């Protein structure tokens, strides 16, 4: 009960903080994200592509998500490659570490940790964040970010709506046309691997 109460208090505090941050029509956290992108030389074009796909997919599976949940996913998408400045190898781990420890005005430590966890699970195995994935909101955010990263892996122009997703309770069904699949064999292969990863996870 104590942990639950603490979680509710943290959540309420973050909601109040977010409201205060946005009262003048601007959110200092947006400026913090832009500064981190500049500081860590993030590929802005790729960040926008991934953010666009992640936002589109998340709206389909979580239409009633809170504005904060949507924004957290977009911020994580915007910063998912910040660790490439350290190394291209395992950059998701470097990105997660940096976001979890960097000074980012406007963000609570708890919110930074959630976003760092999202970034860490953008690729690779899912077991590293079993506890986080037990939270449905986090699991759907993670799925949408991972799918967006896969969809944008070629780092070129994309059709955001070429890949659709349908939700059935806790299950997800990917929908795409045969022409798109034929023209994107590498992406199709990665999507099949992704489906297998979630299947092994029991999702």
Predicted regions and their residues:
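Short conserved micro-motifs at the rims of enzyme active sites and ligand-binding pockets
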Residues: 9-11, 130-131, 185-188
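Low-complexity, glycine/alanine/valine/leucine- and proline-rich hydrophobic stretches
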Residues: 154-203
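Phosphate-binding glycine-rich/basic clefts of nucleotide- and phosphate-handling proteins
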Residues: 1-17
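Loop/helix patches that line or flank the sugar-binding groove of alpha-linked glycan CAZymes
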Residues: 42
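Long, charged amphipathic helices and adjacent flexible linkers at domain junctions
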Residues: 18-39
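Conserved active-site and cofactor/substrate-binding residues in soluble primary-metabolism enzymes
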Residues: 3, 28, 45
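Generic beta-strand/beta-sheet core signal
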Residues: 1, 11, 76, 112, ...
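Divalent metal-dependent catalytic cores for phosphoryl transfer on phosphate-bearing substrates
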Residues: 34-37, 46, 51-167
């Amino acid at each position: 009960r104590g942990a639950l109460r603490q979680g509710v208090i943290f959540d309420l505090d973050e909601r109040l903080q977010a409201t205060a941050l946005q009262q003048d029509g601007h959110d200092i956290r947006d400026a913090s994200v832009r500064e981190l992108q500049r500081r860590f030389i993030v590929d802005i074009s790729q960040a926008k592509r991934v953010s666009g796909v992640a936002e589109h997919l998340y709206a389909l599976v979580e239409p009633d998500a809170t504005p904060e949940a949507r924004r957290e996913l977009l911020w994580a998408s915007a910063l998912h490659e910040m660790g490439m400045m350290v190394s291209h190898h395992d950059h998701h781990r470097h990105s997660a570490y940096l976001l979890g420890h960097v000074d980012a005005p406007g963000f609570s430590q708890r919110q930074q940790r959630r976003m760092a966890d999202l970034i860490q699970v953008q690729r690779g195995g899912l077991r590293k964040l079993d506890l986080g994935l037990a939270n449905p909101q986090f699991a759907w955010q993670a799925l949408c970010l991972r799918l967006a990263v896969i969809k944008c892996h070629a780092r070129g122009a994309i059709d955001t709506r070429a890949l659709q997703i349908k939700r059935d309770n806790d299950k997800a069904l990917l929908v795409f046309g045969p022409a798109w699949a034929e023209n994107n064999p590498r992406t199709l292969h990665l999507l099949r691997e992704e489906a297998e990863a979630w299947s092994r996870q029991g999702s």
